[in-house]
UniProtKB/Swiss-Prot annotation:
Transmembrane segments: 4-24, 37-57, 87-107, 113-130, 134-154, 167-187, 208-228, 242-262, 272-292, 305-325, 330-350, 386-406, 416-436, 462-482
Family of the protein in this entry: Belongs to the complex I subunit 4 family.
Name recorded for this polypeptide: NAD(P)H-quinone oxidoreductase chain 4, chloroplastic
Organism from which the protein derives: Vitis vinifera (Grape)
EC number: 7.1.1.-
Lineage summary: Eukaryota, Viridiplantae, Streptophyta, Embryophyta, Tracheophyta
Length: 500
């Protein structure tokens, strides 16, 4: 047993070190940038160290548990712990946040506040992935929301205030349902409130009540990992935000919703989940088709990538709804894979916008000649996004396919229909992503412009892109990297579903 409070250190370090930014000397932005990157790197190394040396892979139970009394009055503890489900997203958070601070190098306006908000967001994300207490989960979920709102409303495009307001209305509306669900589960069935994950997981509820809880939590998580029809904040937000914020949004924020679905809706409410899972699969297939076909109609480059990430989230929802270990493992793999790919694509869109100052696809063209490196990386990563074999997206979508085919929950005809519709979605993906590349990079439009001299990407940008590209290839060739973390935990979750 390890008694050092590793997880508390990991959760508290970014925000407490970030608040020291305001006391740094006024010597331009260089000090602030390097300090922030140093904190992110330190945090990432610390997390990796803890997970390498203090985490047993073959143990599906919760590990590194910390439990400190916080508010005695209603049994509210600072309770942290990780298992195979949360270790992947936490490492992804560290990785993407470090790269996003590196991507935010050009930000010079109010850079202290900007970097502090990045670090505060980091703490909130790791806290919500590792909390083992429902109320603490809710608090971390909300803590993560405020920095995002400020990052959206202060740095970004012309309509950034509109999109930030839309974002906060959607997510705060979802959080009301989350709070109601947390309090309902905590106060049910005993005189003393229990907010502990472990006791709530062993608690049994009347079916009607469980369905109500399930719907409440589902609305909250459906806003966050946008499930249609609650996805409309996402394209606006991505269209206006600064691209380092976009990396955090696409890479981590969307994954919090999917993580919540698995962590709360599947673990705590298995009966209701078995009732709703066919509907989840139906919504997921509709989402793949709808978002892919909407994406090909977008003029705005960032909105097109945003719709593509809505479409990719459909696979995660299908995997969660299939209630098989294959499907759920595929969903977790897709969470990690799309975290890398979404961040990389938004970073590419942002860097090319920095150079040519155009965001509409029909005004671009011919960028491939002056910027070959950006063109190469964009081609490779959009191929990975359309699930090219050998890349991480392919493995994840394939495993989700197998999960839905081997599911005991569905009869043969629905399986054939769902698989067919998913295949159509996979055909629509190359249509929008390849036409995006064609409109941006081929042709002669910009090349004939008078000021047609553009810089290609520098070493910093190439470093960000290559360090995202390596895990994408690595997971694609050897998916057991990610699967070995979650496979025991997935079996433990699915053992609750007694009808299997």
């Amino acid at each position: 047993m390890n008694y050092f409070p590793w997880l508390t250190l990991i959760v508290v370090l970014p925000i407490s070190a970030g608040s020291l930014i305001f006391f740094l000397p006024h010597r331009g932005n260089k000090v602030i940038r390097w300090y922030t990157i140093f904190i992110c790197m330190l945090e990432l190394l610390l997390t990796t160290y803890v997970f390498c040396y203090h985490f047993q892979l073959d143990d599906p139970l919760i590990q590194l548990v910390e439990d400190y009394k916080w508010i005695n009055f209603f049994d509210f503890d600072w309770r942290l712990g990780i298992d195979g489900l949360s270790i992947g997203p936490i490492l992804l958070t560290g990785f993407i946040t470090t790269l996003a601070t590196l991507a935010a190098w050009p930000v010079t306006r109010d850079s202290r506040l900007f970097h502090f908000l990045m670090l505060a967001m980091y703490s909130g994300q790791i806290g919500s992935f590792s909390s083992r207490d429902l109320l603490l989960f809710f608090i971390m979920w909300e803590l993560e929301l405020i920095p995002v709102y400020l990052l959206l409303s202060m740095w970004g495009g012309k309509k950034r205030l509109y999109s930030a307001t839309k974002f906060i209305l959607y997510t705060a509306g979802g959080s009301i349902f989350l709070l109601l669900g947390v309090l309902g589960i905590g106060l049910y069935g005993s005189n003393e409130p229990t907010l502990n994950f472990e006791t709530s997981a062993n608690q049994s509820y009347p079916v009607a009540l469980e369905i109500i809880f399930y719907i409440g939590f589902f609305i909250a998580f459906a806003v966050k990992s946008p499930i249609i029809p609650l996805h409309t904040w996402l394209p606006d937000t991505h269209g206006e935000a600064h691209y380092s914020t976009c990396m955090l949004l696409a890479g981590i924020l969307l994954k919090m919703g999917a993580y919540g679905l698995v962590r709360i809706n599947m673990e705590l409410l298995p009966h209701a989940h078995s009732i709703f899972s066919p509907w989840l699969v139906v919504v997921g297939t509709m989402q793949i088709i709808y978002a892919a076909s909407t994406s090909s109609g977008q003029r705005n480059l960032k909105k097109r990538i945003a719709y593509s990430s809505v479409s990719h989230m459909g696979f995660i929802i299908i995997g969660i709804g299939s209630i098989t270990d294959t499907g759920l493992n595929g969903a977790i793999l897709q969470i990690i894979s799309h975290g890398f790919l979404g961040a990389a694509l938004f970073f590419l869109a942002g860097t090319s916008y920095d150079r040519i100052r155009l965001i509409y696809l029909d005004e671009m063209g011919g960028i491939a000649i002056p910027m070959p490196k950006i063109f190469t990386m964009f081609s490779i990563l959009s191929m990975a996004s359309l699930a090219l074999p050998g890349m991480s997206g392919f493995v994840a979508e394939l495993i989700v396919f197998f999960g839905i085919i081997t599911s005991q929950k569905f009869l043969l005809m629905p399986k054939i229909l769902i698989t067919f519709v998913m295949a159509i979605g996979m055909i629509l993906t190359p249509i929008y992503s390849l036409s995006m590349s064609r409109q941006m990079f081929y042709g002669y439009k910009l090349f004939n412009a008078p000021n047609s001299y553009f810089f290609d990407s520098g070493p910093r940008e190439l470093f960000v892109l290559i360090s995202i590209f390596l895990p994408v290839i690595g997971i694609g060739i050897y998916p057991d990297f990610v699967l070995s973390l979650s496979v025991d935990k997935v079996e433990a979750i699915l053992s609750n579903f007694f009808y299997r």
